[in-house]
Structure formats: C-alpha cells, structure tokens
Amino acid sequence: MSYVTRWLFSTSHKDIGILYLIYGMVSAMVATGMSVIIRLELSGPGPMFLHGNNQVFNVLVTGHAIAMIFLFVMPILIGSFGNYFLPIMIGAVDMAFARLNNISFWCLPPALVCVIASVLIETGAGTGWTVYPPLSSISAHSGPSVDLAIFAIHLTSISSLLGAINFIVTTLNMRSIGIHMIDMPLFVWAIFFTAILLLLSLPVLTAGVTLLLMDRNFNTGFYEVAAGGDPILYEHLFYFFGHPEVYIIIIPGFGIISHVISTYTKKPIFGQIGMIYAIGSIGLLGFLVWSHHMYVVGLDIDSRAYFTSATMVIAIPTGIKIFSWLATLYGGELRLAVPMLFALGFLFLFTIGGLTGVMLSNASIDVAFHDTYYVVGHFHYVLSMGALFSLIAGYYYWGPAMFGLKYNKVLAEVHYWLLFVSVNIIFLPMHFLGLNGMPRRIPQYPDAFVGWNVVSSWGSIMSVISVLIGLYSVLVQLTNGENEREEIQVTPDYLESNNTRDVRDSDLELITSRPAQYHTFSELPILIQQI
C-alpha cells in the first residue's frame, strides 16, 4: 500500500481520525487568525486596522464562527477522537461503514475552501454565522459569497450526517461480546447522543439554508416579506438546529472530561448511570428551547414564559454532571498531569459560562442583554473554555496513544497556564462591556468602552502566543518525542484495587499497544465482568 493510497483512500478508522485531527488544526489556525484581526480592530474606538471598512469586519466574524464551529471543534471532538477511539472502546474491528467514513472526511476540505473563498470573493459574506435574511438576501449581498458560505454549511452537514449514521450503527451493532449498552464508557455514550442530535437537527438547518439559496438564486419568496414570506421562519429553522448544535459541540467534551478525571483521580466516575441520563436529558431538552435566541423578535408572553422555564431546566442535568465530577474529585488521589489541569480549568470556566447562561435564559433580562457583548462573553466561556479545554485535554490524554510519542510536559504546562490566563483576559471584560450596553458585530464604539476593549485585545495577543506554544509542543512531540511505541500500557491503578471490575471496557484504549496497531485486535476481545 503506497503512502498516497493509504491516506487518500483509507478506510481505517485510525487513519481517518488522524486526518480529521490534522484538518481541524489547519482550520483552527485560519479561524484564530480571523479572531485576532477582529480583536485588533476593536482595540480602539475609531477605525483601526480595517480603515473603517465595516463589511470586512463582519466578513471576518462570519468566517471565524463557521471555521471554528464546523471546521475545527466538530471535526476534532467528533471526527478525530470519536473515529479513533469509539471502535477501540467497544471492541469493534472498525466503524460499521468504513468507506462511508472516508467520504465523510473528504467532504470537509472543500468546505474549508468554500469558507476561505467566501471571505475573498467580492464583498464577502458579512452576515454573521447566523446568515439572517434579509441581510443575506440577494438585495443586500448580491455576489456569490453568501452562496459559498451556504455550500460550506451543506458540505459540513453531509459530512456530519454520514458520520452520525456511522456512529449510531457502530455503537448499536458492533460492540464486542460482554459489552452491554450500560457498560459502555461515557465517551462512547457522549458520541452516541451527539450523533442522534446531529441526525435530528442538521436536516432542519439544511432545509433552512437551501430555502435561502433558492430565495437568492431562483426568485422564490420564502423569506421575502413583499412576496408573502417571513424572515422569522428562517430564525426558527436556524435555531432549531443552532441550539442542539451547542450541545453537539460540548457533549463529546463532557465524555473526554469524564475519562480524564476518572484516570487522574484513580476512581470510577461518581454516578455513571446518572451521568448517562444527564447527557440524554441535555440532548432532549436542547431541542425544546430554541426560541430563547429570539426573545426580541416579538414572541407572545406565553411563549417567552415557556422558553424561559424550559431553558432553566437544562441547568439541572448540567449541574448533575458538574457535581458528579466534583464528587469524583473528592477523596481521589489527584495527579495534576496536563490533561487533568485542562479538565479542572474546564470545570471552573464552564461553570461560569453556565451561570451567565442562566441569566440570559430570562426573557425579561435578555431584552437588555440581547446582541450585546454579554452574549459573546457567555458563549465564548462555554465554547472557548468548555469545548476547547476539553479538546486539548483529550489531545494530551490520548495523543500519546495515537502517535506512540510522549509530549514535553513543561511546554504543555506553559501552554495550559498561558491559555487559561489569556482566555479569561479576553472574555471576562466582555461581560462588563455587555452590561454597559456595547452591541455585538459593530466595529466602532464610544470612547467610554475603550478600557475593557483594550484589555480584551491584549488577552487575544496572549492567547495567540499560547496557541503557538501549543503548536510547538505538538511539533516537539512528533519530531523529538520520547518513544512510547511497542509498550503495552498497563491499566490505570484504580482498576487494580476495584474489586467489582478488574478491567473496565472503558480502558480498552489504554491496554492496547501504543500506537494502536493498524488492526487493533487480532481476535475480538471478550469482556468478563467479575461480580
């Protein structure tokens, strides 16, 4: 098998997982570059780096959001870690549809090309990632930029749908003998629920943006008021996907954090069944709250009361997860390895993001907060410190298993501390700006807001330095990393003293060779539970 053939036509879940990882890192660099330009423009009250070209500012906001969400976080958390480890954890030979797995990856590089092209062609897609009509209609954005952004969303949707079908079928049908659904590790449950969410929500998004595409190019009037359409319909279709999407991003992170905390406290996760039900509840409730993004469009009072209450209910299963992790930490033999540092950072910062979310769930308060930097601060605490920290924790936890090479612990710790400090310096001031009424998506602002904006922009520069240190850490690992090949990794210590189960199925990835062989199991494992 030649090198080109192996990587282009691969049907191995491990090779495809590594391709997703490389792709996600490239997309992350593109998206981070855009975010830095956004923050540099906001470092002063008047026109700064973009010379007053506000359209370019909004184009960067659109590109940053689409690249970060669809091309970075989802491909790595679901595509890379999910593909690589889910079959190993359930004792499967490979994914159920191995060739489908290949095409679901190769839908993504054209999506990145479309996003970059949409930024560079004509005036760009200055719509924000929500792509609301009438701003995204042909009258406001006449060039092909918005069409390209829609095509990028179509491609990522196809990729995610095919992947979701694959994950569901693999999980249900390809578990090894002795692994029942209830025994599956929390990361497998997380990917399973995420796949169900993708399967139910993505068709709605695809329908919504396809109608927009037809409005733009075929003179239909779905969102055109003069033709009897309604732009609010688009908001309902978009957010029926958009809210489950935030859980699609964070639920795999929950799974990773569970594994990391379990390993580095030498304890099984507190309340495993409760954790599974909590993930399922979060996923279900995520479909019932979409209009909390739309309190200011003129919903009647009953709708606002319902969506406020339903949104607050999501805090209950989320709280169960947070407190179960804390209960696992309590009395555990903590080892502050790098993945554990990121997991602890995740717990602290994700909780803060959740608390600001509870405030935003109130319809009456949200009227004041809507479209201010308070919202930007909230969702970046959840994404930039929830999803991102869990993603990096997953890389440092499983990276040695994927590549058979150890990372430099000093570099990794510097990466953690600098990132932890810098993301707080960026996003904490945004809450203060939002409370004072600074609107989102607007590059110029009154002088009164300059102080916190300067602080936030300096934090952005610091975060870029931390990202570069993280990349250098990966480079050192891959070029000069201490060899961990051919070792059979022993199971974590807590299993040896855990009488109920000598080797849990969740640790199959820890007891295979590092890196896992091209064919993980020469014969299928049988897991025997000792009771």
From Swiss-Prot:
Residues that bind Mg(2+): 370-371
EC number per UniProt: 7.1.1.9
UniProt signal peptide: none
Binding, Ca(2+): 41, 46, 443
GO molecular function: cytochrome-c oxidase activity; heme binding; metal ion binding
Membrane topology designation: Multi-pass membrane protein
Amino-acid positions noted as binding Fe(II)-heme a in the UniProt annotation, renumbered to this chain: 64, 380
Pathway: Energy metabolism; oxidative phosphorylation
Cofactor: how and how many bound: Binds 2 heme A groups non-covalently per subunit.
Subcellular location: Mitochondrion inner membrane
GO biological process, one term: mitochondrial electron transport, cytochrome c to oxygen
Catalytic activity, as annotated: 4 Fe(II)-[cytochrome c] + O2 + 8 H(+)(in) = 4 Fe(III)-[cytochrome c] + 2 H2O + 4 H(+)(out)
List of residues binding O2: 247
Subunit text: Component of the cytochrome c oxidase (complex IV, CIV), a multisubunit enzyme composed of a catalytic core of 3 subunits and several supernumerary subunits. The complex exists as a monomer or a dimer and forms supercomplexes (SCs) in the inner mitochondrial membrane with ubiquinol-cytochrome c oxidoreductase (cytochrome b-c1 complex, complex III, CIII).
Family of this protein: Belongs to the heme-copper respiratory oxidase family.
Protein name: Cytochrome c oxidase subunit 1
Lineage: Eukaryota, Fungi, Dikarya, Ascomycota, Saccharomycotina
Gene, per the UniProt record: COX1
